[in-house]
Amino acid sequence: MTDAITLPSQYDPKQTEAKWQQLWESSGVFHADPNHPGKPYCIVIPPPNVTGSLHMGHAFEHALIDVLIRYHRMIGRNVLWLPGTDHASIAVSTILDQQLQAEGTNRFALGREAYLKRAWAWKESSGKTIVGQIRRLGLSVDWSRERFTMDEGLSRAVLTAFNRLYEAGLIYRGQYLVNWCPASQSAVSDLEVENREVQGHLWYLRYPLTDGSGYLEVATTRPETMLGDTAVAVHPEDDRYRHLIGKTLRLPLMNREIPIIGDPLVDPTFGTGCVKVTPAHDPNDFVMGQRHRLPMMNLMNKDGTLNENAGEFAGLDRFVARKQVVARLEAEGFLVRVEDYKHTVPYSDRGKVPIEPLLSTQWFVKIRPLADAALKALDRQHSPRFIPDRWAKVYRDWLVNLRDWCISRQLWWGHQIPAWYVVSETNGEVRDDTPFVVAMDETAARAKAIAQFGEDIELQQDQDVLDTWFSSGLWPFSTLGWPDDTPDYRRYYPNTTLVTGFDIIFFWVARMTMMGQYFTGKIPFRDVYIHGLVRDENNKKMSKSANNGIDPLILIEKYGTDALRYSLVKEVVGAGQDIRLAYNRKTDESATVEAARNFANKLWNASRFVLLNLEGQTPGQLGTPRRQDLTASDRWILSRYHTAIQTTRERIESYGLGEAAKGLYEFIWGDFCDWYIELVKPRLQGENAKAKRTAQQVLATVLDGTLKLLHPFMPHITEEIWHTLHQVADNEVLAVQPYPKANRRAIDPDLEAQFSLLIETIRTIRNLRAEAGIKPGLYIAALIEASAEEAPIFEAGAADIQHLARLESLTIGSGLQIPQRVFSGVVGKSEVLIPLAGVVDLEALVSKLQKEGDRLRKEIQSLTARLNNPNFVNKAQPEVVAAAQAQLAAAQQQLAIIEHRLQSLGVDDKTQP
């Protein structure tokens, strides 16, 4: 007999995880080779922002991706998981600006060069933290291909994309109304605007007609903008005002004459049906202003204060100006009344202040041609495929309703716009009429400018940077070497799958599909797997603003990486569904993750048992069992094992990752650990060498395959156990072993059904013993009143039932003589009974059951009264009412069981035996 191969008595996640993360990386097992013969499977990581550290949403997303990546690597695909980070222009700028403010300065005082030096230092620090956290998660990425959205290769891709779009007439510079964030002093895209419902006011103002014949009343939620009014509009079909169209009004406070116009955009039911028109500060007014050729009077400075066009109110903050304008209007008799009014106000998602619609010269992408091409791919080729498919409609609707994309940001951190103004043509100033050239670099720009304006020129590069989503939109192909035709680009583009949250379908997914389709002629990924959000213990979305996030590293330190990863994946009940993570903020404990750690410990202990009983032999030395030597329990566990292989593969292939994780849990904990290992112990401890070896072969086969099945979900612990099981060198790892394939001939549904009946029988006897208070170590008698079709199954499994239910005798038959004082339970079409006389104190048992019956009757009475109370049913939250109804049903069921038990003991209600 060889000395047993064993594992330590306890699993140490910290030691094991650190060891394998280092070995995986140093051995290069995750390095992608374009020449690998397997079919490509590529995912580029949704790049985390370099804004500090990863949060639980990242851990969730990365755990899902790693399941897909490890699985496809093990089935022989040519796998690339490319890591990287995003420069996050607005987010990082906000952090740096806050730091500078705390130091009593700002970026303008610091200067662009020093500011960018500081930004790069932040990126290095934050990026290092994020990479360390990704490594801590044990993700199987190819670190040799790590990318950053502002590294040299990706910057060249951004410059190329901008130049090509500009040359095609799809990028232009124009004066339009943009969403302006006074806090960050930058334009923001429509998608970076958060619409909030607020309780505000509606001010009714009186505008006098210049001919002295009367006045019009207008209603507004922003009275300070009336200083920039250039018209009052009414609906052309509104009989109340149609006769006034073409007349003029005197603008209060400003004493300016403005026209009354008719426009179908006006809602006659809003306010008085007359609306003030401020084209430079409202999107609808801007449209009307263009249609009627109204002057565009900008009132705002970039910091949210009023400019010189506001007259005496110049220099005031917009909200201070609001109060003073209202006070003046009231003092001069122009304020009619004020009403409370709930309405929607757009806020900057980053700056957290109300957006100011501002007339500004910006750079735009002409989006319609790009969106139409993406729509064509979706409608004709169903590309990309969304999982779940309901998101395809959301994606489509958004593409249909897109407006031109403002891509310039008044920031310094990011890709500086590759446009150079020929300022020598406008006295050294950059003005709206200053000519410019677009080029890849200043040398090329100078050559273009000289060709147009001669040698004596002065150039100045545009100071703005591109919207972060511009470079992110190129991520699936720029990371692979585009615009060059590299081996990686040829082999791994289009990507296979994108895994991302639904909250950035608009920000990111659509940008990538439009950019990919335009520049490469292909949608950049085949599938888009949309996952939900991670919610906290109160079912609220985790976010920085709510201050309810959970640091993944806290739970990793406490429970281990595998436990966190597995718990997050297992919680997914369906593609796109949110998950809930139980967490105690006082103790940093999570029942959800603790359950996954317990599962890891269960696997570890079961593996220790198997290894000890293999007596130093590896699966290779033991060989495979011969079918004629297999017992029924061997054939059952092998059937369950191959069923698990089949269902796990099917679920992963169809993105049912949560279902796959749950299925493996049930097979490993239930079928293998709780049942087969217990069933096989007598043979391992017996004298029959042949039976023992067959049991060892089955144990080794199932454990080896189970570790492979579970590896994508819990990579570290499975790698450690597999390595110990096979006693192989460090460079031979589970991560690249073939994933098990189901042997359909080994799957026996009839045998599985028979064992389900036997297992349910054992479980029922155990429950009856517990209800009766029978000591666990006491061997008792049991009877099975068996149906004709089930009797042979019970007979064949009698030895297993007796062994696992601790029975000294088991009688199986039909029409049995049933003794008095029994507990019974139904199993299938049969009944299981255990006699209690001489086994328990019957008087004490009756007393215990009666007390429990009395308690349940009181509970039922209380719950019934509560649910019959209309005040409770009508006023309580629906989930509270549903919980009370469920509690009542459970209590009634428990009482029925108690009463049945008392009758079995010969007790009618509360009478003694």
Swiss-Prot record:
Chain location of the short sequence motif 'HIGH' region per the record: 48-58
Biological process according to GO: valyl-tRNA aminoacylation
Top-level taxon of origin: Bacteria
Position of the signal peptide: none
Short motif ('KMSKS' region): ranges: 541-545
Similarity remark: Belongs to the class-I aminoacyl-tRNA synthetase family. ValS type 1 subfamily.
Subunit-level organization: Monomer.
Summary of the function given for this chain in its UniProt record: Catalyzes the attachment of valine to tRNA(Val). As ValRS can inadvertently accommodate and process structurally similar amino acids such as threonine, to avoid such errors, it has a 'posttransfer' editing activity that hydrolyzes mischarged Thr-tRNA(Val) in a tRNA-dependent manner.
Protein name as annotated: Valine--tRNA ligase
Native organism: Thermosynechococcus vestitus (strain NIES-2133 / IAM M-273 / BP-1)
Lineage: Bacteria, Bacillati, Cyanobacteriota, Cyanophyceae, Acaryochloridales
Gene designation per UniProt: valS
